[in-house]
Amino acid sequence: MSASNAIVVASAARTAVGSFNGAFAATPAHELGAVVIRELLSRAGVEAAEVDEVILGQVLTAAQGQNPARQASINAGLPIETTAWGLNQVCGSGLRAIAIGMQQIAGGDAKVIVAGGQESMSLSAHAQHLRAGVKMGDYKMIDTMIKDGLWDAFNGYHMGITAENVAKQFQITRDDQDAFALASQNKAEAAQKAGRFKDEIVAFTIKGKKGDTIVDQDEYIRHGATLDAMTKLKPAFDKDGTVTAANASGINDGAAGALLMTEAEAVRRGITPLARIASWATAGVDPSVMGTGPIPASKRALEKAGWKVSDLDLVEANEAFAAQACAVNKGLGWNPDIVNVNGGAIAIGHPIGASGARIFNTLVFEMKRRGAKKGLATLCIGGGMGVAMCVEAL
């Protein structure tokens, strides 16, 4: 692909990440997505009618209405002629949406694409099949957040057990995990206090009877986290295990996205892009150790870009669990000092369908801030997969 046909990031933005039943407790995912879409267009100076399509990842769509991506698009002010659709590759959805947007443009099917992800874990539904009725007795409800977002369909257990499996395979101790989690919290706290997330975040206004509330700060980050507090927690998924609530990612709400076009289109419009997408890849692994997915996915993405691990200046590797994040660091052998320099999902949170686009945002803005040349974003994916994307400064 020539430089002029390279796919670039014309703009990127995200909402703050909300805590479970926190600031965004009553806000549907599509409303979060709509705010991000409007901000993407505003930052790039692109008119709503100039967007060819909107592609948004979202995992938890039960009872959210038809096609939440279309709802986000229309609510953002895009014309009805602009199509929109959603995808579900679990935790990789937001980054996969960006990859598909890249492909749409590279294939000549679009000029301008909005891609990213949105998720409200707080509004995920409880449900059950009642078409045939219940003749007598109690009937158990299913938590769709757990069933559709956090449960391994092949082995019949929680994602936390897959993290326990990874910890055993890679010999990652409880101490290793707690130390990693504390570092994530400390880095995120420092980044938030220094204002390093401000360029990423678009403020979201929540209207209330007592006035408006502006949400423009990540809500989940724990200031003053201590190792002593973490070590007191009991294992969350296996009584003899090592994975706890403190060394696992959060349950969160949020949205994030990117506006994509070719470099030539950006030049024509007078837009200075944030970065160029160099390559992307996905890979499958055993579902029981799904957290290792970023290892083969990152290797494939690097190979497609013609890069080596040593070429990377920055990495955003999603922290589903400290155990799997440590395993990915070991498996790829990269310098941990360049990974998640502003903290990761353990501290910031993990709104599953949006997280891929969230870490993509954090990567491109931190690359710009540091003057970094080459970066990589990667996530593990429930069901046994990984996705990765290589990004290059222009």
Model regions: which residues?
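Flexible glycine-/small-residue-enriched beta->alpha junction loops
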Residues: V112-N165
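N-terminal extracellular/periplasmic Venus flytrap/periplasmic-binding protein-like
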Residues: V8, A13-T15, A25-V35, R43, ...
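Glycine- and Gly-Pro-enriched alpha-helical subdomains that act as flexible
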Residues: E263-D311, N329
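Conserved catalytic cysteine-centered active-site region
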Residues: Q58-K111, F154-H158, G224-G250, G331-R358, ...
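Active-site-proximal alpha-helical scaffold in enzymes
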Residues: Q89-E119, A167-R196, G257-A264, N329, ...
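Conserved active-site "lid/cap" helical segment
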Residues: S2-Q64, P68-A76, I80-T83, T162-R174, ...
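Beta-strand segments within the central parallel beta-sheet cores of soluble alpha/beta enzyme folds
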Residues: A49-G57, T83-N88, I113-Q118, D176-A183, ...
